[in-house]
C-alpha cells in the first residue's frame, strides 16, 4: 500500500480529474460485450442500467467471497493458496460487468497452480483466446460480413462454463473428493503457503 500511495498520491494531487477518470468511467459504463449481462441482453432484450450492474456485481462478488471463505474454513483439508486465489478471481470475472481481454490473464497462473488437469486448463485457454477475435469479427456488423452475435455468445458461454467447470474441480479437490496431485507431490503441504504452512 505504501508503494501504491507513493505512485498515486502525486498524480492524484496534480491531475485529480485525470486520476479519477478510470473510476468515473468504470462507474458509469454499462456491461462490456463479452460479459454474461451482454449475452442476456442480446438474447432476451433485457437491459441493465450501470447502477444496477454496479450494485449487483458488487453484492454478487461479496456473496461469492463469503461462500469461498466458508468453503475454505469447512473443507476436508486446508485449501491451497492457489485454489482460493483461483476461486476468488473467477468469482470476480464471472459477475463483473467488465471483462477486458487482459482480465483473463489473471486466471492463468492460479488455474495452472490450483488444477493440474492440463486438458481442462488448455481447453479454457483456447476458448478464451477465441473470444477476442470473435468479438472483433462480430463488431464488423452484418453488412461487412461480421458474424452474428450467436457465435460470439457461444464462445462467451463456453468460456464461462469452462471457468465454472475448473472451479467445480477445485472445490471437489478441496473437499477431498478427488486427488490433489500438487499436495501429494509436496508431502501433503502447500508449496505456496510458505511460513503459513
Language model segments and positions:
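Alpha-helical transmembrane segments of polytopic membrane proteins
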Residues: 26-30, 53-60, 150-163
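Aromatic-enriched
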Residues: 121-197
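Central hydrophobic cores of alpha-helical transmembrane segments
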Residues: 1, 83-89, 109, 120-131
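Aromatic/glycine/proline-enriched transmembrane-helix motif characteristic
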Residues: 30, 34-94, 171-197
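Hydrophobic alpha-helical membrane-interfacial segments at the cytosolic entry of transmembrane helices
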Residues: 1-11
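Hydrophobic/aromatic-rich transmembrane helices and adjacent perimembrane loops
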Residues: 100-117, 129
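Extracytoplasmic catalytic-loop and juxtamembrane helix elements of membrane-embedded
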Residues: 11-42
